């Protein structure tokens, strides 16, 4: 079946459908990872986005339940150069095509993804849509232009859990950790549990006072989709957490929320960082880590906030982490849990546990 990729400037690219035969609109982004398409598709940070995978052949190893980062596909669509419908992997339980159809997600192959990626790098991430149809219709462009975009939209409310839940086991665990779910990935929860925390996950809108009353030793602010600026409730909760002196760890969107709560600003990036090969320098040690990233907004270091930067991206000098003098705080813009990506930064989960222990001993 034919499929059409339509951008908001009127560009039309024709290809072939290999997902659900429907249509979807969203922000068009690209990810440079060579593998990990299942983890990418199920990452809640991709809510309202259509993903272009730059690696030219996708689907080779199929789908396995252990590679899910949430309960479903979160992206709005998928764009690839060539789809492989015969996976070679003893663990594969289904094809990528079947997986997409189960969750009613359209996908298009036969697209010049190099050309599309170069366009995005030059012009910024456009709004666009995938439309599965026998012929092109002018209505497709109208639907793309009606998409409101990512900026100014609270997407954390869309992907957060509706109820509080316990992750892993609490038996024998010394410290309770409250996780704010703005779109948390499963592997983050696994690694927090493995670090020794008794993990409880809370909906994004849960008042900080309610969690404090229940009892916790520390807080974690998760990754999530879109623009952090509209999340007033999250910024307010973070300020209350810091007023009480709780140890705090934020990843990706969580890092941005902490930045806003400290008086810094955020901005939308031209095309963002999405892939598993971003070099980041730890400014306290001088060590460079290769990191997995997925974000389209960044904290600005405009010099107006006194809080120092702790990590820096070596490709474009964007802020990758911030500190607060005298406060038990750890933030990173990147994804230390990888899934997919390198494991260079997984030590941060144990580092946070040690930070909590040091803080509790000092009280």
UniProtKB/Swiss-Prot annotation:
Keywords associated with the record: Amino-acid biosynthesis, Arginine biosynthesis, ATP-binding, Glutamine amidotransferase, Ligase, Nucleotide-binding, Pyrimidine biosynthesis
Glutamine amidotransferase type-1 domain segment(s): 176-362
Superkingdom of this protein's organism: Bacteria
Binding site for L-glutamine: 45, 224, 226, 253, 256, 294, 296-297
CDD domains: GATase1_CPSase
Keyword field contains Amino-acid biosynthesis: yes
Name the UniProt record assigns to this protein: Carbamoyl phosphate synthase small chain
Native source organism of the sequence: Leptospira borgpetersenii serovar Hardjo-bovis (strain JB197)
The encoding gene: carA
């Amino acid at each position: 079946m034919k499929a059409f990729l339509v951008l908001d400037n009127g560009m039309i690219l024709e290809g072939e459908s290999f997902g659900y035969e429907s249509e979807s609109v969203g922000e068009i982004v690209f990810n440079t990872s060579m593998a990990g398409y299942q983890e990418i598709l199920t990452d809640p940070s991709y809510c309202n986005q259509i993903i272009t995978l730059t690696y030219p052949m996708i689907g080779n190893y199929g789908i396995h339940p252990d590679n899910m980062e949430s309960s479903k596909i979160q992206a709005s669509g998928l764009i690839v150069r060539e789809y492989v419908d015969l996976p070679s992997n003893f663990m594969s339980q289904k094809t990528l095509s079947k997986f997409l159809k189960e969750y009613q997600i359209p996908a298009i192959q036969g697209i010049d993804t190099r050309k599309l990626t170069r366009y995005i790098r030059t012009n910024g991430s456009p709004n666009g849509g995938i439309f599965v149809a026998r012929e092109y219709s002018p209505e497709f462009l109208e639907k793309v232009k009606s998409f409101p975009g990512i900026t100014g939209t609270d997407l954390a409310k869309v992907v957060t859990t509706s109820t509080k839940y316990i992750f892993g086991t609490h038996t024998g665990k010394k410290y309770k950790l409250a996780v704010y779910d703005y779109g948390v990935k499963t592997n983050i929860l696994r690694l927090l549990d493995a670090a020794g925390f008794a993990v409880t996950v809370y909906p994004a809108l849960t008042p900080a006072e309610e969690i404090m009353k229940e009892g916790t030793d520390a807080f974690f602010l998760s990754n999530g989709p879109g623009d952090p600026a509209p999340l007033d409730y999250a910024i307010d909760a973070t300020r209350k957490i810091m007023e009480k002196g709780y140890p705090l760890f934020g990843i990706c969107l969580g890092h941005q929320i902490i930045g806003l709560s400290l008086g810094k600003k955020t901005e939308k990036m031209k095309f963002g960082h999405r892939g598993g090969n971003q070099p980041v320098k730890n400014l306290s040690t001088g060590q460079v880590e290769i990191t997995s990233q997925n974000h389209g907004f960044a904290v600005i270091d405009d010099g107006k906030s006194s809080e120092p930067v702790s990590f820096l991206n070596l490709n474009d000098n964007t802020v990758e982490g911030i500190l607060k003098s005298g406060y038990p705080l750890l933030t990173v813009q990147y994804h230390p849990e990888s899934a997919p990506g390198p494991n260079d930064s997984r030590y941060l989960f144990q580092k946070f546990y040690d930070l909590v222990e040091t803080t509790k001993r000092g009280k």
